[in-house]
Amino acid sequence: MIGLVGKKLGMTRIFFEEYTSIPVTAIEILDNIVVQVKTIENDNYESIQLTTGFKKEKKVLKSEYGHFLKFNVSVGRGLWEFKCKNSSNYSSGQKITINFFKNIKKLDITGISKGKGFAGTVKRWNFRMQDATHGNSLSHRVPGSIGQNQTPGHVFKGKKMSGHLGDQRTTIQNLKIVKIDDINKIILIKGSIPGSIGSDILLKPSIK
C-alpha cells in the first residue's frame, strides 16, 4: 500500500473546549515526487519509488544522481519505495500531496527509534529488580539464571539479555489523525511516534 514520507518536527499539545487536552506529534509532509514506477513486466513486482525535500548535488552519490537524472526528477533527500497493486496509475514526476490522507482516519507510522546505547535487562526488557536488602550484595539489577544444566548446555537463541537498545526500524499502528494543515503541510498525530526530531518518517493508511 502506498504511503508518504514526512519529517518529524516534535511534540505539542492540543486543547479542547471541554478543558481537556491530548499530546500530538507534528509531522511535516512536503510534496512527495514519484521517481520510478516499477511494474511486473520489468521488475517482477509492483511498487513506486518516492522522494521528497531537497539535497545539494555535491552531497549526492553519482549513481544516485544519475538515477534522478534518468527519470528527470530533481534531487531529493532520499529514496523510499512503497509496494502497491496499481503502480500503473502513477508516473515519474507526479506529485502526491498531504491531501492524500484527507479521508483517512488512522495511520501506521514507521521510523528509526532513538538509540539508547548498551542497556541492561531492567531497562531493555522491563525485568523486575531483585531484593534491595535481605542479604542481597551487588545483585540488584542482574537478570538471574540464563540457562538450565549440562543439557542443553547452551543459552537459547533469542534469550532476553543486556545489549544495544533502540536505533531500530519501528512501526506503531492505528495512530489517529487529529488535524491536517494543508497550507503549512503539517499533519498532527495523536500520541508519540518513533524517531528523533528531524528524522524521516513513513506514513501509511492503517491496515487494521
Curated annotation (Swiss-Prot):
Keywords: Methylation, Ribonucleoprotein, Ribosomal protein, RNA-binding, rRNA-binding. The keyword Transmembrane helix does not apply. GO terms for cellular component: cytosolic large ribosomal subunit. InterPro entries: Ribosomal_uL3 (IPR000597), Ribosomal_uL3_bac/org-type (IPR019927), Ribosomal_uL3_CS (IPR019926), Transl_B-barrel_sf (IPR009000). It comes from the Bacteria. The keyword Kinase does not apply. The modification N5-methylglutamine is found at residue 150. One of the primary rRNA binding proteins, it binds directly near the 3'-end of the 23S rRNA, where it nucleates assembly of the 50S subunit. Part of the 50S ribosomal subunit. Forms a cluster with proteins L14 and L19. NCBIfam families: L3_bact (TIGR03625). Belongs to the universal ribosomal protein uL3 family. This is Large ribosomal subunit protein uL3. It comes from Buchnera aphidicola subsp. Cinara cedri (strain Cc). The lineage of its organism: Bacteria, Pseudomonadati, Pseudomonadota, Gammaproteobacteria, Enterobacterales. The gene is rplC.
